Amino acid sequence: MHAESTRYDVIVVGGGHAGVEAAAAAARVGARTALVTHRAETIGTMSCNPAIGGLGKGHLVREVDALDGLMARVADAAGIQFRLLNRRKGPAVRGPRTQADRALYARAMQAAVAETPGLTVIEGEADDLIVEAGRVAGAMLADGRRLAAGAVVITTGTFLRGLIHIGERQIPAGRVGEEPALGLARTLDRHGFRLGRLKTGTPPRLDGRTIDWTALEMQHADADPVPFSTLTERITTPQIACGITRTTQRVHDLIRENLHRSPMYSGGISSRGPRYCPSIEDKVVRFGDREGHQIFLEPEGLDDPTVYPNGISTALPEVVQAGIIAAIPGLERTRILRPGYAIEYDYVDPRELDATLQTKRLPGLFLAGQINGTTGYEEAAGQGLVAGLNAARLAGASELAVFDRAESYLGVMIDDLVTHGVSEPYRMFTSRSEYRLSLRVDNADERLTPRGAALGCVGSIRAAHFAASQGALSEARTRLDTLSLTPNEAAAHGLALNRDGLRRTAFQLLSYPEIGWDRLAAIWPDLAAVPPRIAERLQTDATYAVYLDRQQADITAFRRDEAVRLPASLDYGTIAGLSNEMRVKLDGVRPTTLGQAARIEGVTPAALTLLAAHARRGRTQATA
């Protein structure tokens, strides 16, 4: 046993997608940071599907990038099939996504961590927290090492009392071949945190050399791949195609015949899994009338024969999995390299947190990722960045940062978690935001990079790149505002406008669906020199301009309610007229603002009026 004690400003437990962003963010702010993980070689491991981004998720990756996080740049370096989802829909709901080479991704992430000044990787298992005077003061490792710190961030993913299920077999593990985190689960239990159980699953991995690719429909990468990071000029990694197949009636019959052997239906698992990523057993039971379910065969790397069959997550016994695979077109002779499985794990009710991701119960302790009830690499990365940033600011005695719903999907996600809690793994969608016209992938840097610079987590390279980009955008916008046409002049160029005699600027012309940048460049040739990314951004701004003006009124009202602070020590029992039901609901969340109180399910307008009056009286007394 070791008895050494080392001092850091911030300790991050876990080297997954939340952990690396937390550690890197804390170090960027200037905190002396330790990243504690079982093995350094597993940092950045993609435990489930080899992909980054998607609908809603791509927005989070862009926001992490805007705050100088790692995920976007690493995904750009490792991406092997870039596709922009929802390309035919409006810009606000488009989602960049890429398949990633699993090995390339981990190597690139490990290199990024190694190159981060002030960040030390410590191999070991965090077994307990050091608590002094009612607040976290460090972490104890299983081998006896004592790490002192001003703040600790826990990002244990599925490791917290993790239990793998394959048919009737149960294997204690955080993921295949790795031990679960039992000590920290006991620690959180001991300190009174509300813990629950969730589950997720993964499909069997296939040997791509035994797949009949000629029998499959192929899905190719975009010809013009869109990077995640604004710092990435172009994608240089070779791009590959994925195969598409479907389940068959024979597959469905096999599943129905063996449902009693699936832990989700035998009683082996009672916890809930992700609604939007159901197992193949759930799909067959819930959508029994369908003839087949789509499966995407996603290669896990350029030099790796392993294929991830996206769409058939399962925990059925291995022999049943083999039968299922053999009954799928193109996979009749395919070899399974590793069986699919379900995994149960502990999570902390996220209503135990405030909007900074610090726990209310234990100051100095921050939580991020699946431990907060979310699912997905991108959700984890976003939380990790916010938690690491705030842990560093707490250790440095600076004011903590809150990202609100009107400025970012990060704010939407965190507010959803800490206000509503979860009953199933939380996944980000654009539909979760009431301000999604403003929260687009193309303006994430404009929304968040200046904020990140003020908070100290944006480095000089990104700051300089952002300044140059904004300068070019402003110059192009000014040029559009100085160019104009009358309806008659427009008609001479083949543009049909209302003959009202009013001049319209080039920016206003862009708001017409039939007028694109190419049409304007034909009229004013110097516009052809504007970089495509800036031209596309200005076209989007013009398209949404009238709607954004209306939305700004909603945002102003939102910010007005968010400005009404509710004291952390507020005793709801002292507010006359507040019903017992309202007191219980409010006490369960302990909202920090009137706006957050309004978002608690079941809180009535009458209760909000009483809260607002109480807050006003408190301000009056404080200034008297």
From Swiss-Prot:
FAD binds at G14, G15, G16, H17, A18, G19. NAD-binding protein involved in the addition of a carboxymethylaminomethyl (cmnm) group at the wobble position (U34) of certain tRNAs, forming tRNA-cmnm(5)s(2)U34. InterPro entries: FAD/NAD-bd_sf, GIDA_C_N, MnmG, MnmG-rel, MnmG-rel_CS, MnmG_C, MnmG_C_subdom, MnmG_C_subdom_sf. GO terms for cellular component: cytosol. SUPFAM superfamilies: FAD/NAD(P)-binding domain (SSF51905). HAMAP family: MnmG_GidA. GO terms for biological process: tRNA methylation; tRNA wobble uridine modification. It is found in: Cytoplasm. This is tRNA uridine 5-carboxymethylaminomethyl modification enzyme MnmG. The keyword Iron does not apply. Pfam families: GIDA, GIDA_C_1st, SAM_GIDA_C. One of its GO terms (molecular function) is flavin adenine dinucleotide binding. Keywords: Cytoplasm, FAD, Flavoprotein, NAD, tRNA processing. Belongs to the MnmG family.
